[in-house]
A protein has these predicted regions:
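Long, terminal "pre-/pro-" and other extracytoplasmic accessory regions
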Residues: 2, 6-8, 18-146
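Repetitive helical segments and hydrophobic/amphipathic motifs
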Residues: 13-14
Length: 146
């Protein structure tokens, strides 16, 4: 009986902790992980950072950076790219794996890649014609959302 109550209380506590979300807090460029700073300097050398925040989520802390051009980039705690949204602009070459770029150019020659997200098992690509593609880790299209 005591063990059952303990498990119920533990489940409630863990559930509450997972739902409790710390607010994003502003950070300076120097507080971003080195890999994130390098990514921004290489891919957006002439774009200034409007603001950067850190989400201190207990499970997966991450950083979000918004550039003056409106580009939003999300990094994991180590500075690895998680997501990029370009708000109607083409994402610079070199950010997206060449296999995805070539596939998009082959099937959608007149559109730009405007969004890219790296998941644990998939990639998601947003195109300027509002089509969204989901690919597996072998770059096979597994879902098309239009």
């Amino acid at each position: 009986m005591i063990m059952k109550r303990f498990l119920i209380v533990l489940t409630c506590v863990l559930g509450t902790m997972s739902l409790a979300k710390a607010d994003d807090r502003p950070v300076t460029v120097d507080q971003l992980p080195q890999a994130a700073r390098t990514f921004l300097n290489v891919n957006f050398p002439d774009d200034k950072i409007s603001f950067a925040t850190k989400d201190d989520d207990l499970i997966r802390p991450d950083y979000q950076v918004v550039l003056a051009s409106g580009v939003m980039v999300k990094f994991n705690n180590a500075g690895g790219l998680e997501e990029i949204e370009s708000r109607g602009r083409e994402i610079p070459d070199g950010i997206i794996p060449i296999q995805i770029v070539e596939m998009v150019k082959g099937h959608y020659p007149d559109v730009m890649i405007t969004g890219y997200e790296v998941g644990r098992r998939t990639y998601e690509v947003k195109l300027s014609n509002r089509i969204e593609l989901k690919l597996d880790r072998n770059f096979n299209v597994i879902e098309i959302d239009d």
